[in-house]
Swiss-Prot record:
It comes from Arabidopsis thaliana. This is Serine/threonine-protein kinase 1. One of its GO terms (biological process) is protein autophosphorylation. The active site is at 371 (proton acceptor). Residues 1-12 have a biased composition (Basic residues). Belongs to the protein kinase superfamily. STE Ser/Thr protein kinase family. STE20 subfamily. It is found in: Cell membrane; Nucleus; Golgi apparatus, trans-Golgi network; Early endosome. Serine/threonine-protein kinase. Regulates organ size in coordination with MOB1A by modulating cell proliferation and cell expansion, possibly by facilitating cell cycle exit. Positive regulator of the pathogen-associated molecular pattern (PAMP, e.g. flg22)-triggered immunity (PTI) signaling by stabilizing BIK1 and activating RBOHD by phosphorylation to promote the extracellular reactive oxygen species (ROS) burst involved in defense responses to bacterial infection. Residues 249-503 form the Protein kinase domain.
Length: 836
């Protein structure tokens, strides 16, 4: 019992911790029996003046109780992370800025005095563990005389036994005092004010002496002050300093804003080096702050030419400042957006080679990036490749996403991540393969599909490939195929991919990217001049546009703000040029980053108002039946955005009427359509007369659009991955008498009615009584395609069958849910094929 008594005390759940802690000493007796010794320690522990042995242990929360949870957490870790040493990244330390409820960071030193003499008849002033939660608080208030006497008695004993003392110091909560004054301040203003309110005499934070026991005197007081100073300097990682960053850096302008905070471009006052500073609000992300601090310590160990350097971190009361290397070339995704061109194969090989070097280094130090994409592959002004936006930003994004909406898109996710299996650094290899397709084609695979459906498609579909088989070399095709191996065990590592011929034969250096970077810089400068000539706001308003839009270090943003009154404000050319007719959410197709910076260089208010009026007129004219201003051959399409090139696609008049009427069934499609309609109504039917100089797309994009249009015009369909064969019930195709008395005649009335309901109703699962109020006649072209295609007729008939089952059969909850999903899949399939 003598050796187990400290452990038994640690295993018990500690009481809720008070705001102020004082000294506590635990005495153990080795001569008593186990049961009687435990009872006596609870009632009246012994004390002796001649103590010859001290045992020190660190008390941190409920260590034994949390051990089982830690084991469970370890079992859930990926294999790569399970190999990490226990102290990798730094352990949890005392955090003076955390809430009282967070117990992970509060620990001190507990001195255990072991007594080997016989039992003393003296009553000890110390009780068992519950006194930890009562006595210190009463002593701090000074409201309990008995407690004060007991403490004085303990101090006398301490003087005899020798100098020792134990304590846990927790600073007072200071967060509630400054809320009202900072409401109207900007993020930077609040952060600077927060820094200036802190004490920046050095790297140590001055502790409030009132937080310790007011009864300590003499040598004990000096010991406690020394220990206070020691704990305050070691409570924060060495990488986080308490200096005010505004005294070391000159903040130039804001580069962007995300869910975690803001990114600023700054200049080092001593070296004149340009850096990027992320300002993170701690009050919004405290639940993950311990992980963030540990991640910062590990990031300081990263030292590789292909990884963005983290130059340091600064902590105020409410803000964390992370200083990192500034990449003036922007991200690869922004480079393609600005120049409106995909990359050449030799440029892709160079970027993949450098990115693999950075990934191999990160994996060698047991670090997984988890967010490789074109927006996080950064370029310096000289063309060097850097991997950015990992570690702190990724951890913060995951923390913030717990209380915010879904951040980012899953197009780059590996199958094992989506299936929530264990994964390692090979997920970065998969993401690099998707990024290679993104660099070659301008957009990642399945870019026009809703993110939630992409999760489903990545899991069940074959791995994506390069679309143009003839344009790219065989080694490039093989490189992409190796990266996109669905089975993680068969997928090569980053170090193995460095030996692939595609990157091994690449002899180009950073100069390969110089032409693109220079062209991008010129385009941005032109955009900035155009913005200043159209609008005349302050320089601060225009400083975030143009050249700075892509400098937020790894966050993909729409690079080209609207320049003319006739332009849709959220259109990004490259992000829209490959979107095909199966787009479900037209407004979300191309913004893949975790942050969007909206430009403000719009035209004057009068032009905006007139444009809005034109858009309303054009949209109303379309949905009345036949468009007024459009000849049949020039109806704009949802994925055609070239307003300068004369239309190369001829649509039948019947199809144009069909398109305009179908647009009423989709709000997103209608928004796109009337934006383009306003443009052509102003300039007549000749689209080449418009002034949209910055919305042209390349010939390669139009070649793909022509190819897709020819598929649709020929009546063919692309494979529909989300429709299963089991959805098509045989009874729906073979039975003449369907349930509910629905009779099917030779003309396919049931199928036509089902398609009519699909065309009219935006809710595929709405009840019959609600349909029919806003019915519109089925367009002749759709009716003709339905009656001449047995496949479409079967699909429509199956839809009618499942709707009848859902509406008229008594189904259990699970069966009803399955029917709803089947109906939704069939509706999506028909809408995709018929382009509703």
């Amino acid at each position: 019992m003598d050796h187990n008594s400290p452990k038994s005390r640690r295993s018990r759940k500690p009481e809720p911790k008070p705001d102020i802690y004082s000294t506590f000493v635990v005495h153990s007796d080795s001569d008593s029996d186990q049961g009687r010794d435990r009872d006596k320690r609870k009632a009246k522990p012994e004390e002796d003046e001649n103590v010859d042995l001290y045992a020190t242990m660190v008390y941190k929360g409920d260590s034994d109780g949390e051990g089982e949870e830690d084991d469970d957490d370890d079992s859930m870790l990926p294999p790569l992370l399970k190999r990490l040493p226990k102290d990798f990244g730094g352990g949890a330390s005392l955090d003076y800025d955390d809430d009282d409820g967070d117990e992970s960071g509060d620990f001190g030193t507990m001195i255990v005095k072991t007594d080997r003499s016989s039992h003393s008849k003296k009553n000890s002033p110390y009780s068992s563990k519950p006194r930890m939660g009562v006595s210190p608080r009463r002593r701090a208030r000074g409201g309990d005389e008995e407690s004060s006497d007991e403490e004085d008695e303990e101090e006398d004993d301490d003087d005899d036994d020798g100098d020792y003392g134990t304590f846990v110091v927790k600073s007072k909560d200071k967060k509630g005092k400054k809320k009202d004054k900072e409401i109207d301040m900007t993020t930077m203003g609040r952060a600077v004010a927060s820094m200036q309110k802190s004490n920046f005499g050095g790297k140590t934070r001055k502790l409030d002496p009132s937080s310790s026991s007011s009864k300590l005197h003499g040598e004990d007081n000096r010991k406690m002050q020394q220990q206070n100073s020691k704990m305050s300097t070691t409570s924060l990682p060495d990488s986080i300093t308490r200096e005010d960053p505004t005294t070391k850096y000159e903040f130039l302008n804001e580069l962007g804003k995300g869910s975690y905070g803001s990114v600023y471009k700054a200049r080092d006052l001593k070296t004149s080096e340009i850096v990027a500073v992320k300002v993170i609000s701690l009050t919004e992300g405290e639940e993950g702050y311990e992980e963030i601090r540990g991640e910062i310590e590990m990031l300081q160990q990263c030292n590789h030419p292909n990884v963005v350097r983290y130059l340091g971190s600064y902590q105020g009361e409410d803000y964390l400042w992370i200083v990192m290397e500034y990449c003036g070339g922007g991200s690869v995704a922004d480079l393609m957006n600005v120049t409106e061109e995909a990359l050449e194969e030799y440029q892709i090989a160079y970027i993949c080679r450098e990115a693999l070097k950075g990934l191999a280094y990160l994996h060698s130090i047991y670090k997984v990036h988890r967010d490789i994409k074109g927006g996080n592959i950064l370029l310096t002004e000289q063309g060097e490749v850097k991997l950015g936006d990992f570690g702190v930003a990724a951890q913060l994004t995951r923390t913030m996403s717990k209380r915010n909406t879904f951040i980012g898109t899953p197009h780059w996710m590996a199958p094992e991540v989506i299936q929530e299996n264990r994964y390692d650094g090979k997920v970065d290899v998969w993401a690099l393969g998707v990024s290679a397709i993104e660099m070659a084609e301008g957009l990642p695979p399945r870019s026009s599909v809703h993110p939630m459906r992409v999760l489903f498609m990545i899991s069940i579909e074959p791995a994506p490939m390069l679309e143009d088989k003839e344009k790219w070399s065989l080694v490039f095709h093989d490189f992409v195929a190796k990266c996109l191996t669905k089975e993680p065990r068969l997928r090569p590592t980053a170090a193995e991919m460095l030996k692939h011929k595609f990157v091994e034969r690449c002899k180009t250096g950073a100069s390969a990217m110089s032409p693109k970077i220079e062209k991008s810089r010129q385009i941005r400068a032109t955009m900035a001049l155009q913005a200043q000539s159209v609008v005349a706001p302050s320089l601060e308003d225009t400083s975030t546009l143009g050249p700075k839009s892509s400098e937020e270090l790894g966050i993909t943003v729409p690079s080209k703000p609207p320049q003319n009154s006739t332009e849709a404000p959220l259109t990004s050319t490259l992000n829209r040029q490959h979107i095909t007719g199966n787009t479900v959410l037209a407004g979300e197709g191309g913004d893949f980053g975790t942050m969007i910076v909206h430009g403000e260089d719009e035209t004057e208010e009068s032009d905006s108002r007139s444009q809005l009026v034109r858009e309303k007129e054009s949209s109303s004219s379309q949905f009345e039946g036949v468009p007024r201003e459009f000849p049949g051959e020039e109806l704009p399409d949802s994925w055609i955005h070239d307003k300068k090139k004369p239309p190369a696609i001829d649509l039948p008049v019947e199809a144009s009427i069909s398109q305009s009427m179908q647009a009423s069934s989709s709000h997103e499609h209608r928004t796109k359509l009337h934006n383009i309609a306003g443009t052509q109504m102003e300039g007549g039917s000749d689209a080449s007369g418009s002034t949209l100089k910055n919305e042209t797309v390349g010939r390669k994009a139009f070649a793909l659009q022509d190819k897709l249009w020819s598929i649709y015009a020929a009546g063919n369909t692309v494979p529909i991955p989300f429709l299963r064969a089991t959805d098509i019930s045989p009874i729906a195709l073979l039975s003449e008498n369907m349930i509910g008395g629905m009779q099917q005649d030779g003309n396919g009335t049931v199928a036509v009615e089902a398609l009519q309901e699909l065309f009219t109703s935006s809710d595929p699962q709405s009840k019959k009584g609600r349909r029919g109020q806003n019915e519109m006649p089925l367009p002749p072209s759709v009716y003709q395609r339905l009656t001449t295609s047995s496949s479409l007729m079967n699909l429509a008939q199956v839809l009618a069958y499942h709707r009848a089952c859902y509406e008229e059969m008594p189904l259990q909850e699970l069966q009803a849910t399955q029917e709803q999903q089947t109906i939704q899949n069939l509706c999506d399939t028909l809408r995709t094929i018929l382009r509703l």
